[in-house]
């Protein structure tokens, strides 16, 4: 089923101009965080326009929203702003209900406080031999995501009263993605947290203090320690090393490990809040085709190295006059919020089938496996024009102009894929 969009009404007026300015500012901030080549200086995004040609939308499926869309990470959006919204109870990283004193305090019952930041001393036998014991396998889904902060993932400058942005950190694709696992009916593979696992859900990067979660686990090191009989009696460190090993009665003495409780594990991750699912929540999969005249203007300087390095900078203006893409869009409606993102070709192929994934890399679709071939990017074509450095016959007078155009196009593709493709998504408050 096709959908007609009143593109002029949606992109014009004060609201359309405000949205265009926020997108321009967002792309500009992204370019300021990019390490520029030596011959380029001062890239500025000056304008953005939606154009006059609307995209073509075709509804392919309806389903329940993705679980990621129910994570409540907006501290400025109070419960009272939603009609009939029940009070949300905090849950821990495993999805269990957490009392208020547990959610706000790292202490245990009776006022006992667990020192989660107490450093662990290396066993004496390990210091003596210089060989580190084998550690147990680490679940990469539990690594503190703020060890790898993305300082370049702010919200839309100018306020987020009606627009939000979410970007989790992940490096898996194809069949290893959550969507691929759900479509096959299999649980997520190793390295992905489960449905109740902790996920980063902050729109702005925050400094994370050192925590027990951010350190490698030492829970399995007891099985790798050498036995008492295998150590030499003449070892001067023997008496100290035996403190971390089981004794003859099978009891272990670990004076350097802070006390823990199975009901209150050491975890500095703040409890996440999940919004309640309701029957009226829904999600739409749309095949989106666009070949319009959306425009983006950038200015930069090309540095000339003659007669000396960076002798002079020539201003250059680049105009992106249109682009073409074919992808599957996801639009979810959850109580006054609209979540929007695109699916990668792998996820779209898994969920919707190869015929709706936008798979053909070009115009040749006669081959049997052409629908399985994934394009290098969802953006199939980007048209760009430069206003300096061209002769009358159309050839470039400055060789670095072509390099600059290529660099800008690569960055535009990268920003689009990182910020608009699931598991990244945008949230609009309505």
UniProtKB/Swiss-Prot annotation:
It comes from the Eukaryota. One of its GO terms (molecular function) is lipid binding. Keywords: Endoplasmic reticulum, Lipid transport, Lipid-binding, Membrane, Mitochondrion, Mitochondrion outer membrane, Transport. Residues 211-233, 241-251 have a biased composition (Polar residues). One of its GO terms (biological process) is mitochondrion-endoplasmic reticulum membrane tethering. Residues 1-430 form the SMP-LTD domain. GO terms for cellular component: endoplasmic reticulum membrane; ERMES complex. Residues 85-96, 265-276 have a biased composition (Basic and acidic residues). Residues 61-117, 177-276, 352-377 are annotated as: Disordered. Its main location: mitochondrion. Belongs to the MDM12 family. Component of the ER-mitochondria encounter structure (ERMES) or MDM complex, composed of MMM1, MDM10, MDM12 and MDM34. A MMM1 homodimer associates with one molecule of MDM12 on each side in a pairwise head-to-tail manner, and the SMP-LTD domains of MMM1 and MDM12 generate a continuous hydrophobic tunnel for phospholipid trafficking. The SMP-LTD domain is a barrel-like domain that can bind various types of glycerophospholipids in its interior and mediate their transfer between two adjacent bilayers. HAMAP family: Mdm12. Component of the ERMES/MDM complex, which serves as a molecular tether to connect the endoplasmic reticulum (ER) and mitochondria. Components of this complex are involved in the control of mitochondrial shape and protein biogenesis, and function in nonvesicular lipid trafficking between the ER and mitochondria. MDM12 is required for the interaction of the ER-resident membrane protein MMM1 and the outer mitochondrial membrane-resident beta-barrel protein MDM10. This is Mitochondrial distribution and morphology protein 12.
